Amino acid sequence: MHMPLPGAGYVLGNKDVLPEITKFVKSIDPDIVGLIEVDTGSIRSRMVNQAERIASDLGMNTSYETKYGSKSINQMLPIVRKQGNAFMAAPRVHGEKFHYFDTGVKRLIIELEMDEFAVFLVHLSLKYRHRHLQLRKLYDLIMETSKPVIVAGDFNTFWGENEIYLFLRAAGLTSANVESLPTYPSRAPRKELDFILYQEGIEVTAFDIPHVKHSDHLPLVCDFEVA
């Protein structure tokens, strides 16, 4: 799920959205939740760590980190330095790792290792060249993983799945969104920017893109089993 980042409310965000997001996530009753552009406690969120607040309200664990590399100038900027990505998971889930791309502004990769599979959460660059360098790094991480892999997040693919076709083939990944339905913007979706991708060994049993407008991106909901 892509957390809201409204331009007009960047300095002081809409405090009413967080309870609505929590209510929506609770209605799905998920085992794992990925959050993109989560605020970890800036003035925009009124010093509330959104990942911790949602996880606490749902009785889940959370792992989060800023989406910028340690040497990025963004680490020095108010508000921006508190923007990150997060996993929320049931208490039995553990074993997170943080990786960083070598290029782009948004560099964070969160890896969540389960007993039978691994999940990578990403937010790729807006720049085409940087995205494809990031995909190369992501491919290397996937190849180092001995378990079936799920990759999810905001890929910023303005050409949709066609832009990552070769990456999918090379990594043995399939999109859960078989109809290539658009996910952005939520008010009138036209672009497929967000993906849940999975390898052989994972069986998707259900997939949905609920039309809720708590964010500028629509959320992706996927049920799966380990084959």
Language-model segment annotations:
Residues G34, A118-L121, I150-V151:
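Structural recognition of the beta-strand scaffold that forms the well-ordered cores
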Residues V38-F117, D208-H211:
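Structured beta-strand-rich core segments of catalytic domains in phosphoester-bond hydrolases
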Residues M1-D57, Y64-S72, A227:
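N-terminal, active-site-proximal structural segment of metallo-dependent hydrolase catalytic domains
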Residues M1-A8, N85, E111-S125:
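Active-site-proximal beta-strand elements of phosphoester/diester hydrolases
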Residues V93, K97-Y100, E113, H130-L133, ...:
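Metal-dependent phosphoester-hydrolase catalytic domains
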Residues M47-A51, L133-Y139:
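Charged helix-capping and loop-helix junction motifs
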